Amino acid sequence: MTNIRKTHPLMKIINDAFIDLPTPSNISSWWNFGSLLGLCLIVQILTGLFLAMHYTPDTMTAFSSVTHICRDVNYGWVIRYLHANGASMFFICLYAHMGRGLYYGSHAFRETWNIGVILLFTVMATAFVGYVLPWGQMSFWGATVITNLLSAIPYIGTTLVEWIWGGFSVDKATLTRFFAFHFILPFIIMALAIVHLIFLHETGSNNPTGIPSDMDKIPFHPYYTIKDILGALLLILTLLMLTLFAPDLLGDPDNYTPANPLSTPAHIKPEWYFLFAYAILRSIPNKLGGVLALLLSILVLALIPMLHTSKQRSMMFRPFSQFLFWVLVADLLTLTWIGGQPVEHPYVIVGQLASILYFLLILVLMPVTSLIENKLMKW
């Protein structure tokens, strides 16, 4: 008799995706982040569901309802901080996952990569609307500043902003619709993640060498299930340490002040995971130019498959490209730091140089270096 997991229509799908999936035997721990992102998404949906049971999306009561969750709901403070810090863990895993994809040439899987870029946009949108919900000072002013950027669009800009706001300023209508978006988007992310996996399993996973490994595949279970469990335990440990020992480490103290349209915070800045994009936005003195640069800083990822000029897929055997990759990582860390600093000398010029370097690396230096490496390899 054939095993039920190989015959039952539903079990067969799970079996082909997580049990009997042929996997390269040499993938490193950098390949753990996909499953960790799945875990983060589950944690966020569960904690978010319990928060939604007690939260009220109304300007008069939103801030109080979050306080009520922390003070009066059984373990409400744990759920709230797991959700807030879970978002940070989500982005850490996301950026590591993308960095691994860039380094090892995973963008050769065009469909998988493009769905990944769409996923990144969706996750960023979810995090943005979610940050508005506690209705603190930074929530309110962050929403005002970022939505206002759309007014830079010629002709329809102002109308578009007022349409998103549901009025002439960020108010009750804005908060209500942002809550609705924040509730629906994670399920859209889940659907996209499944599509991401479907496309990945069409080709099979890449591996550190970038060389096809069809002749050397091993079953996903038990080898990689156990490896993923180790990663999951480390992720949960880090999240719990953050939540229980330093819950406000990555947050902004301004968000403990209720939203006040009459008082602007000294420094309006997003959560740490958006600071690199915020720094690029601020580095251009023109509003429309800044908005375009902000969009392009993420959209440029969709161009990476077309900018891949090397004859080798992975950077494993390409030392010059490796160097530029780590320069890019350092540049993004610099931009993240600059995004959190006030707009004054020398931060402005450093931010502008880091922004130029970011686009220069991806669009010019890395493709040209790959061509030079091709020549050095006497191909």
Curated annotation (Swiss-Prot):
GO biological process: mitochondrial electron transport, ubiquinol to cytochrome c
Pfam families, per the entry: Cytochrom_B_C, Cytochrome_B
Record-level Gene Ontology MF annotations: metal ion binding; ubiquinol-cytochrome-c reductase activity
Free-text remark on how the cofactor is bound: Binds 2 heme b groups non-covalently.
Ligand binding (heme b b566): 97, 196
A GO CC term attached to the entry: mitochondrial inner membrane
Residue positions binding heme b b562: 83, 182
Cofactor needs: heme b
Top-level taxon of the source organism: Eukaryota
Keywords: Electron transport, Heme, Iron, Membrane, Metal-binding, Mitochondrion, Mitochondrion inner membrane, Respiratory chain, Transmembrane, Transmembrane helix, Transport, Ubiquinone
Biological function: Component of the ubiquinol-cytochrome c reductase complex (complex III or cytochrome b-c1 complex) that is part of the mitochondrial respiratory chain. The b-c1 complex mediates electron transfer from ubiquinol to cytochrome c. Contributes to the generation of a proton gradient across the mitochondrial membrane that is then used for ATP synthesis.
Subunit structure: The cytochrome bc1 complex contains 11 subunits: 3 respiratory subunits (MT-CYB, CYC1 and UQCRFS1), 2 core proteins (UQCRC1 and UQCRC2) and 6 low-molecular weight proteins (UQCRH/QCR6, UQCRB/QCR7, UQCRQ/QCR8, UQCR10/QCR9, UQCR11/QCR10 and a cleavage product of UQCRFS1). This cytochrome bc1 complex then forms a dimer.
Family according to the record: Belongs to the cytochrome b family.
Name the UniProt record assigns to this protein: Cytochrome b
Organism field: Balaenoptera musculus (Blue whale)
Gene: MT-CYB
